[in-house]
Amino acid sequence: MPLFIATGPGPYPSHRELHPAFYGCFDWHSCVEMEWVVIRLLRLFPGDVPLDRARETLGGLLTPRNIATEIAFFNNPNHRSVERPYGWAWLLTLQHELEIWNDEDGARWAAAVRPLADLLCANLIAWLPKLTYPQRMGMHGNTAFSLLRSLDLAERRAGEGEPDLLSAIRTAGFRFFAQDTEYPAQYEPSGADFLSAALSEAELMSRLLDPARFPAWLDAFLPGLAESQPASLFTPAIGGDETDGQIAHLTGLNLSRATSFVRLAEALPAGDVRTPALLDAASRHARVSLPAVTGGDYMVEHWLAAYASLLLGP
């Protein structure tokens, strides 16, 4: 399915004209992801980032004028489903990163981006009740992953007296996933996955459920974790041709799995019998794909750093 569908005669604007804040990468959501990576590294490891160049670049992108153009794009009725929900969720992730960063530039950029984040929050709130079924896949449409990526900002907004997004996420999460049992994770992965549908759902529910209820839910959902079962879920994915954009997704699957394994272990009580298997799997998956974050083909490099950065923690 094309990213843009012609509804009239050309000429058509360039990607940079449509998206002056998020352009220059393979697609819009990858631009958002990689700008988030730079912001995250500036916040966590400022001494290891080319500081002046990073700030200058972000400062030229994240301006009120550029964000107004982005808003105009998403306000166009023809674009109402573009980047839904994956790109929306990554934009909310970027906004959250800016807001928790104690930095003068970060505060200015957060103020600039917030109107776009507010629009996509409102769009997500309006869309979730219409979603009859969740999408359980290992790619961009995965519902659980996008809810998870949106959750940090939703919780922050709720703490500021704006609970609507958090309420929408919780309602959707419980409606779609709370009753799930014996998930067939033995059929993962598919040949173009960069997410685990099973682990994305489990990680989301680790955030939504009461900590006392989550261990039992997880046992019913994925009953073999203590024994590293199903084996296909605990075995790092084997990629192949990194110049093929679909096959290249499998390199990222290992990192997204590693992150989920760690988060699940953190959500379980001390001494839980599943924790050693989860942490061992996280380590093995990360070792396979971390070397590909830099120095590889563009079809991997243009997005993989985002999934490596998720491993850094909250």
Regions found by a protein language model. Name each.
Residues 1-23:
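Low-complexity, Ser/Thr/Pro/Gly-enriched N-terminal "stalk/linker" regions
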Residues 6-8, 12-14, 171-192, 231-240:
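Conserved catalytic-core motifs characterized by acidic clusters
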Residues 15-32, 72-89, 130-144, 183-198, ...:
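Solvent-exposed loop and edge beta-strand segments that line ligand/cofactor-binding
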Residues 20, 24, 32, 41-154:
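Extended ligand-binding groove/face enriched in aromatic
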Residues 35-48, 89-105, 146-160, 200-211, ...:
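Well-ordered alpha-helical scaffold segments within catalytic/enzyme domains
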Residues 48-65, 104-127, 160-180, 213-226, ...:
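Extended, well-ordered alpha-helical scaffold segments
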Residues 101-104, 208-228, 233-314:
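Terminal, non-catalytic domain-edge segments
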Residues 120-201:
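Loop-centered beta-sheet repeat module
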